[in-house]
Amino acid sequence: MAQTLSKISNKENASVGLWPKRFKPHQPTPTWMVRCGPLDHDSRHGRDPVRASPQAKRVRTPNPYPRHLKPAASAVVRSGTNPSHLKPTSTDVVRSGPETPCCEAKDGGVVRSCKTCNLKPAHDSKAVSFFPAQTDGLTGDEPEFIAEACPSCVLYDTCPNCTSRAINDDGSTDGTIPSWDQIETTPAFLSLLSNTDEEMSADELTNLAAHLRKAFETGSHPPNVDYSKDQLQGLLEMAEAALPPARRQTLPFYQQRLEARRTWREKIFNLPLDELSKILTTSKDRFQRCAAWKVVLEKAVLAKEYGEEAYAYAQEALKNINSFDVNLVLKMAAGTFIGHLRMMTVDNPDMVSYLPKLIVKLKPLTLKMIIDNHENTKEGWLVTLTSLAELYGMVEVAIDFVPTVIGNLFDLLMKTTSKVYSMFKSVILATFTSESLDFTNPFWYAIAAILCFLITGAIPHNGKMKIIKNILSNATGIVAGVKAIQTLGAMFSTWSNERLVNDLSSRTIAITELNNPTITADIDAVINLQRLAETLREEVKSHTLNPLMQPYTPILRNLMSALDNVISCCTRRKAIATKRTAPVAVILTGPPGCGKTTAAFALAKRLSQQKPSIISLDVDHHDTYTGNEVCIIDEFDSSDKVDYANFVVNMVNTNPMVLNCDLVENKGKTFRSKYVIMKSNSETPVKPTSRRAGAFYRRVMIVDVKNTAVENWKRENPGKPVPKWCFNKDFSHLHLSMRGTEAYWREYVLDPTGRNHQSQKAPPDQHVTLEQLDQKMVVQHTTNTSEFVTQAGEVPVFGFVCQNNEIDTVYNLLAAVKARYGANFNLYKGMTRTAHENSGCGAHVHVISREDNFRGKAFTVNRSRLESVPHLEGDSFRRSLGVVMSDKDVTTMFYYIKGKVINDQVNLTELPANQHVVTVHTVYDMAWALRRHLKWTGQWQLIKAAYEIMCYPDTAACALRNWMDSTDFSEEHVVTQFIAPGGTIILESCYGARMWATGQRLIRAGGLTEAGGPQGGVRFAGLGARNVPWSEILREFMTLISHIWSQIKGATVVLTALTFYLKRFRPRVEAKGKNKNKGPRKNTGVALTDDEYDEWRQYKAEKKLDLTVEDFLQLRHRAAMGADDTDAVKFRCWYSERQRNYHDLEDVTIIGRGGVKRELIRKGPLRPRGNDFYDEPDDWYSEGVIDGVTHKNAIVSVDDVDGMHKGYALHIGHGVYMSLKHVVSGNAKILSEEPKNLTFNGELATFRLNTTLPTAAPVGTSKPIKDPWGNPVSTDWQFKNYNTTSGNIYGACGSSCSLTRQGDCGLPYVDDHGVVVGLHAGSGGDKCPSRKLIVPYVKVDMRIRDTCTKEYYKDNVPMISYKGLLVKETGEPRTIMKGTRLHVSPAHTDDYEECTHQPASLGAGDPRCPMSLTGIMVNNLQPYTEAPRTDTATLNRVTKMLISHMEGYVPKIHKTEEDMISAFYMLNHDTSCGPYIGGRKKDHVKDGVLDKNLLDLLSSKWNRAKCGLALPHEYALGLKDELRPKDKVAVGKRRLIWGCDVGVSTVCRAAFKRVSESIMANHALGFIQVGINMDGPAVEDPFKRLERPKHDRYCVDYSKWDSTQPPKVTSQSIDILRHFTDKSPIVDSACATLKSNPIGIFNGVAFKVAGGLPSGMPLTSIINSLNHCLMVGSAVVKALEDSGVQVTWNIFDSMDLFTYGDDGVYIVPPLISSVMPKVFSNLRQFGLKPTRTDKTDAEITPIPADEPVEFLKRTIVRTENGVRALLDKSSIIRQFYYIKAENTENWTVPPKKIDTSSRGQQLYNAGLYASQHGEEFYTNKIIPLVQRAIEFEGLHIEVPEFHQAVQAYNGYFNGTEDQPSQIALASGGTGFGGEVFEN
């Protein structure tokens, strides 16, 4: 669809007189290009013109312009460039273009008739369009003009309004234009709604529009069946929203569409918001909806004129897509609940009398008896209902009413059920026939239509219904039915998404059209517009993350780009209009050569870490200004042509200074440096007689710079250069003297009167150093930044909106309330405000009508009732007005105080009522009382005031004055009277404060404490709750609950205590007969949960006890609280055993003679009970199980061979466990395994298991603080041998209150940090239960000893130097393979020198480069000896940004491959096995079975990896056999081969295979292009992303990429991959391995890499690409922040990248493009070497828009066959020169044997690639090479012609034919196949 937008855009517009590409001036003008009127097709074909019908509707033109855009006079404005709101002042008809008006305007500017244009009256229409006479040679009368009732008809009809008359209802024509059948078969029409590049011609567009016009009028026309009239307009609307306003003229019908929206705007501008909301949600006319959006947003932007309601509505509407306002419903529900609760509790005037009456009415005792005797039977319900009716006196009513209602309902239910059943049965039987399905019943069509309406929000039209019918009618079987349902679901989803995109496009158009200075004239409008654009952008962005919206992602991105332009434009306009802090300017004056420039730069470095910006006043534009904190202006007064005085005055100012810039992107740039350093050789830059002298010298500090050594040298040595010793690094050679303020010379300052400039002597100069000058400038800037801001801020304004006849009533009511509560607000009638906002004033309250344009908090008066003053208590004023106000708003309105006021004169009538009276005896009394008035942030001012009063008690009033100037007061209204020895102080605070202080004793009694204030709670009336925030609703609910509790808390406590008291002494019911001595089973008042009930029954059954429920619960409670009585101890033991054996029981259902019952059956054998006591007091014994121990997730049970629990073991990490010797002795089983590698250290036992728990406990050697159950333990931590029942145990004795039992041995003791320091080994038994025996932890080396794994780089081998490298000897020589498999072709033995590439250097015997292979290897390894550095903080931030970006398209968790063999078969078996096993992987696999050597190696690596441990990271090094440029061959440059160990590759593939596949599968959405097929349709995705408007494109390559990779960046990339895995031990092992330093093995030595990334590392392409993204992102963030732009957003949301290893394409916006030189500089600081793709040393610059982009050695261009990635010609040509065959050292000799089959296929494919470069290259260059190869190499292939080659490649490209293996390999890399053809 996105391509179709450009397809129908002809780049010319009829309104400006431009012709489309396919039309010439001599051709007839097409109908859609006529400016003023349609072609007269009736006259052309010999028919009389048809007059308009009398039923033509009339149109009224309202005047809905806002008051800021009202025209001076009315006029009819037609198509032109003037906006709709700029009306001309004349009464003439205004046309576009320079034509002279030809019509007579009568009746107020309305066109009645025109002889020149042949216009006739159109039924007295108020506003008409007109068409001038035809100028294309046509003759005859013109058709009468008809005023349309709907402005959109101009769009839907357009010029085909006349041509549609030549079309019949069935789609046939009279031959003048094509019929509908012919239209449908045109290629352009068939591609209209498809993703093709064919452009629709103007004739076809005109004919199609004519048929559409006919289809709009006639329902039987064929397009109504197949297509929707909204499809074409929807495409145009999306195109208009995506294009910038300047380019929208290129769209067809743009002026007509614009005129339609303008006309709609005029019609609906004055409608209220609710009517506009209906249009937005229900209108099917897209032009009407778009105009409605523009009206809503325009009123929101101009909130000053139309009120905050419009802005709030627009903000909410932009976020919602026709959604139900659930928030309002919830608010209304909450408000209703609170209101009813208040009515029943607080508002009830007499709770005491109301409750008894309610109880008597309810008759609870009788009601309880009826309920208790109810039975769930028919007779029971009849008796119960009759009893209830008799109880409440409704017997007769029930007898008459209930049977009638029940009977009627039953009859209605039976009839409805019968009819529904019959209909449903008939439909089902008709659908599911015996042979097939039949969905042709209208019932199914209706169901599908309803579903379509529910999903898409619109009823399907005829075309859609036809599609639905076709789908349902074709569903004749089960499979077809399922497919039909899937098809309908997908189709409904597509329609819904299209409607959504159209809606977003309408909003975007409205936003962009409002970005006009004529509309958004003030800063408030600009701010509102930016907020609305940001809101809409977030909405659009949220839809881009929806997977169902992926087909529309390009359109949504274009919408976001358009909104970004609006936001950036608003930002610039705000910056221009925003007040700034005046910079600090200093002028360094002195003679030339004294060192001013060096001092200026040194001062700039002290002031800021950024490099200073440089401005030169000799040029008239300042595009190079960077906006850094410090700005240096050299010789600012050197040119007399520059008005530098005014420049400095404007620069050092609080008003924004807009710089003069030439570049468009820099328009609006402002000066924003903090410090300005200017230099001058003149002591008086501005003459004192100048008119700007005062303003100039007031803004600058002048420092005279003097260098005595330089002056003496010049005086004593004239003509000689100044030596360096005259200058010192510490600037001690300079003498800096700062002048006084306004000193234009050292001796004089400016005269204030301006009469005598030498009348005022200047103060002495102040000697300063650079450091002092730096401090002064910083202090001065801090002073400039600080400005006085009133604490209270803007005075709040409230408005009560009512009818005109209610204004006096509401005003009098508010005046009475103000007098009653002593309120501080100012009351007005209407909008006029008479009170001044002085300190101490209150809020402004206006009583206004609905017509007033009020700005502020408005509350609608639902009713007005003037109460008497005694009735205005509590919240009656809100009830009387029917307004919904929160308590916070009421407090603010009544008692808001602006600023702080201190009154020395006390007037009793002005004093507020006291809330608190405090007698001040000490300073603490006052401090404690003052806390009520302060915020939390103002407590420290309170401490300061208290200290002053304590030191000087007689000056309390003065101390309070000083304290009020600096403190922050609370938003609550508080009044406190302080009675001090020196007088009385009354303090009132609410936002601000008022204080009255007098030396007399004044007692102001009474107040609001008892009567209460006006804050009586929120009253929710109707929909008024929508204006109350949720915080106020919650606050009101909590206040109401506290109020209710304050009324009932006393009675509640008393009744609760009474209930407990009566329950305690309740007599028990004794049973008789058989149940004697048994507790009662019924009506005991005890409720048990299911688990408690099961415990009670099981405990009674096992212990053979007759235990009541109450006794059981008491026993259970005592045991849980740790009681030590016998019953409690036994219950704890039983409960622990039950918990441990929970899984040994099975709940089964038994069916037998006794019926069906459920029982718990034990699955394991019954264990014998152990002994409870030992005779000897010092015996230690093993203990039982108790839940809730520390580190319980790391603890496992140790069982005997028969399943008997023995103790515990603790997991300490990587499969290592520790326990005790007497626990694991014998045949112990842990997790059904026997311990391995069992090691004893005294009593402590350490061992391994194959099972690794996910949780491990930390271990240490400190002193224990807590026992296993978290209780404190006391111990001296002295170790000795103790005699136990298990022998002597070496440990320490401790004391704890925890009770232990058998089986607790092995539980951990921890220190204060939770680290395990010992294990529990026993206790003192029942005679001394608090004594515990603790075995300390001792570190044991449990590292795995490799038995099968070889490792060359060993720690115990000394380091040696080998040819300049630090290496270790391996003891096994490994030589570098010599020779090459590349031979010169027999066809080119004489001219192979013409080829640009040759086989790489072969070593010392090679005449091209005699360097040995070892020397080449060592030279290649030298860069790996150093580790590049990066900015760690920035790198960590960018890593989080990249993860957040990738989470949008990469699934979160990928499962690890757990099978070793499966992981091995995921590898490429044609690659090396690494340093430990020779050959390739496939050499060790026979018939799918691995040989012993490979299997042993993989098993050892896999077992180690399952423990999460790192593997040896070693590689076998070699040199790559490939073709290299001849210049690189001459210097011996040859690339390394890193052969990775097959075990490491298998582990890494198991860990990250699925993650890498997800990243590769989503290359179209992300930055990483690994997996892209460059020879398929996938190449179109990057091509589209490259066409991003207003973005710069950079193509970058890197030299020596592998050796320059920082290890920190590689580690972060590996962590990113781990983030998307399940983090299993295999993943941990892979991460630890890849993060370790690689080891290279060659020539019998092992070399450890310090930095860089081996090219043979697993996942090298993915990791390299992630490294690429991270380093580019870090460089961009650092460059922006160094330029003063703080990056607080995700940088990857602002740019687009293509990365594949070291190849990169960066698509950046202007902001980032402006700092790209710094970005490349930062990349070089990271150690990288960025270059151009052509490998030249020129600067990296953006790729122009008209030049193709090169990526992966491919040039991405659009050819006549589509988008193609062209392989460079040199890569294709050199394939004919060389052949890969047997190994040789004489590569200039052709091979002895040539594989003609593969060689022929190779050259055939080369021809296919060459065909994409054009016929000339293919015919003149490639065909001769192919023919020569056939002749000399003996090949048997046919040379395809050019068009055959193009057709074959297109077949491979589009997937219609399978790609040959070489093309498949080449599409993901740089060559055809193998390393022969790599660059």
Curated annotation (Swiss-Prot):
Domain spans labelled SF3 helicase: 564-720
Lineage: Viruses, Riboviria, Orthornavirae, Pisuviricota, Pisoniviricetes
Modified residues (O-(5'-phospho-RNA)-tyrosine): 1093
Keyword terms, alphabetized: ATP-binding, Covalent protein-RNA linkage, Host endoplasmic reticulum, Host membrane, Hydrolase, Membrane, Nucleotide-binding, Nucleotidyltransferase, Phosphoprotein, Protease, RNA-directed RNA polymerase, Thiol protease, Transferase, Viral RNA replication
A GO biological process held by the record: DNA-templated transcription
Limits of the Peptidase C24 domain: 1188-1341
Compositionally biased region (Polar residues): 79-93
GO cellular-component term (any): host cell endoplasmic reticulum membrane
Segments of this protein annotated with the region Disordered: 37-98
Coiled-coil region(s): none
Site (Cleavage): 148-149, 435-436, 791-792, 1070-1071, 1183-1184
Single GO molecular function: cysteine-type endopeptidase activity
Protein name per UniProt: Genome polyprotein
EC number assigned by the record: 3.6.1.15, 2.7.7.48, 3.4.22.66
Pfam families: Peptidase_C24, RdRP_1, RNA_helicase, VPg
Domain called RdRp catalytic: residue spans: 1591-1716
Stretches with biased composition (Basic and acidic residues): 38-50
Gene3D superfamilies reported for this sequence: 1.10.260.110, 1.20.960.20, 3.30.70.270, 6.10.140.320, 6.10.250.3230, P-loop containing nucleotide triphosphate hydrolases (3.40.50.300)
Chain sites annotated for binding ATP: 590-597
Metal-binding recorded as keyword: no
Annotated catalytic residues: 1222, 1243, 1305
